[in-house]
Design a protein with these regions (language model features):
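C-terminal helical "tail/cap" subdomain of flavin- and related membrane-associated enzymes
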Residues: 3-5, 341-463
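Residues at the starts of beta-strands that form the adenosine-phosphate
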Residues: 9, 32, 329
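Glycine-rich FAD pyrophosphate-binding loop
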Residues: 27-55
Length: 463
């Protein structure tokens, strides 16, 4: 069995966000890194524009966990100018009325809209600039031979489509929710794969900039816009060019579902009925709806994440989650930081490194998977209820009174690096306290704050 000290090179499968960031971490540790990526180089202009792959959002929400990992490798200074801060959720009701619900209780508690492509380009460039990272594009991994440490792949442009192979010392799969490395690990170990489809899908749409040259926004740019409609919702995140990327989340089947929207007339009717204020904002609604793929939503959990001293998976390859807490990318970036910490002792065996990483991360990735599912209900439905706003206001008040003991769960997840499992545990206690305090209150001034202080001391006193 080998150690990190006697392993000069690491092979990564997948040069997306997690893979490119992990390559930087590993290069900084002194490793030579080879990245195998099925796509062609996204930084090069292609002869014809290819449609975005289903399941790959145009823009993402960057929060404190992701920022912390990016700061560790020194790329945040270059990224800040490309980010758009979002201070809260801008709710659009069915009458077109707007209401902003701040994310946090402090001015700096914001999340950021970031371009997936722009961030990937930044990370790929940073990885190559280390001088230790080689990226091989157009190579689709199709299997792993653990006996002789070979990765099998198909090379783009090979007219014969013959399987080729490359040797590896240590293999890490950062190849997303359909991971070939994960499949190989589970086949070799007889492991477990749990795929939990949500029963809802999503479609990306566009709200173009207000002016032809771009740069002018049709709505408030420093907010994440939500049209909550009970069983489904529409959201929109701002882009640097003045446009918004809107995402429609709908059930896959049913009266109001993707299955039912088979004609432009049906799409128009749904939007006129439930999202009327967006009609003037989306001149290409029909074109976008039928031109863009419908994305699939599911939670993926697997066990184990590694095989002996050979291979490991992380990010979506190990624990894909639904997007409703904006934490898929952030959790993957936190994975990169976590495996880097596990590598601080170069004399430990690789299988020990992998085991420690999984022991540390699995409870936390399970927790954020659960919280992401819960947040979908909040975003599409609960957020409309008066009691939600009362509990939100009360949670901020209690945070002011007990800043070290009472931190809203959303804030723990988005603005801190408190482990996800701990945020979930503390959040459950806090939710019980909020329920008790608001059970007979219609407004904040009717809440018994002295009782709140006692409950927090009793239940969160040692937290």
């Amino acid at each position: 069995m080998r150690t990190p000290r006697d392993t000069p090179e690491i092979t990564l499968v997948g040069a997306g966000l997690a893979g490119s960031l992990l390559a930087i971490f590993l290069a900084r540790r002194g490793y030579r890194v080879t990245l195998l990526e099925r796509r062609l180089d996204p930084r090069k202009k292609m002869p014809t524009a290819a449609p975005a792959s289903a399941g790959r959002s145009i823009n993402l929400a960057l929060a404190n966990r992701g920022i912390s990992a990016l700061e560790e490798v020194g790329v945040m200074e270059s990224l800040w100018p490309a980010l758009i801060p979002m201070a809260g959720r801008m709710l659009h009701d069915e009458e077109g009325r707007l209401r902003l619900i701040p994310y946090g209780n402090k001015p700096h508690e914001v999340i950021y809209s970031v371009s997936r492509a722009g961030l990937n380009t930044l990370l790929l460039n940073a990885a190559e600039s280390t001088g230790r990272v080689s990226i091989r594009f157009g190579e689709t991994v199709c299997g792993v031979d653990f006996a002789d440490r070979r990765v099998r792949f198909l090379a783009d442009g090979d007219p014969e489509r013959q399987t080729q192979a490359t040797l590896y010392d240590v293999l890490i799969g950062t190849d997303g929710s359909a991971s070939a490395v994960r499949a190989a690990i589970l086949e070799r170990t007889g492991g477990r794969l749990d795929e939990e489809p949500l029963g809802h899908g999503y479609k990306e749409l566009t709200i173009p900039a207000a002016n032809e040259g771009g740069g002018q926004f049709r709505m408030e740019k420093n907010a994440l816009h939500i049209w909550p409609r009970g069983e489904y919702m529409l959201i929109a995140l701002p882009n640097a060019d003045g446009s918004f990327t809107a995402t429609l989340f709908l059930p896959n089947q049913g009266e109001e579902s993707f299955q039912a929207l088979t004609t432009p007339e049906a799409v128009d009717a749904l939007f006129e009925r439930r999202f009327a204020d967006t009609i003037p904002l989306m001149p290409r609604l029909g074109e976008d709806f039928f031109g863009n793929p419908t994305g699939h939503l599911e939670t993926i959990r697997c066990e184990p994440w590694s095989f002996e001293d050979h291979a490991l998976v992380l990010g979506d390859a190990a624990h894909a989650i639904v997007p409703f807490h904006g934490q898929g990318m952030n959790a993957a970036f936190e994975d990169c930081s976590a495996i880097d910490r596990c590598l601080r002792d170069p004399d430990r065996l690789w299988n020990e490194v992998f085991a420690e990483f999984e022991r540390r991360r699995r409870p936390n990735t399970d927790a954020i998977a659960d919280m992401a599912l819960e947040n979908y209900i909040e975003m599409r439905s609960t957020v409309r209820e008066p009691k939600f706003q009362l509990k939100k206001d009360l949670s901020f008040r209690l945070e002011e009174r007990h800043p070290r003991r009472f931190i809203p769960r959303y804030s723990m997840v988005m603005f801190h690096t408190i482990p996800y499992a701990e945020a979930k545990r503390r959040g459950a206690i806090q939710e019980e306290i909020l329920d008790e305090l608001t059970s007979r209150a219609a407004s904040l001034d009717q809440v018994d704050l002295a009782r709140a202080d006692r409950l927090i001391a009793e239940r969160l006193g040692t937290t």
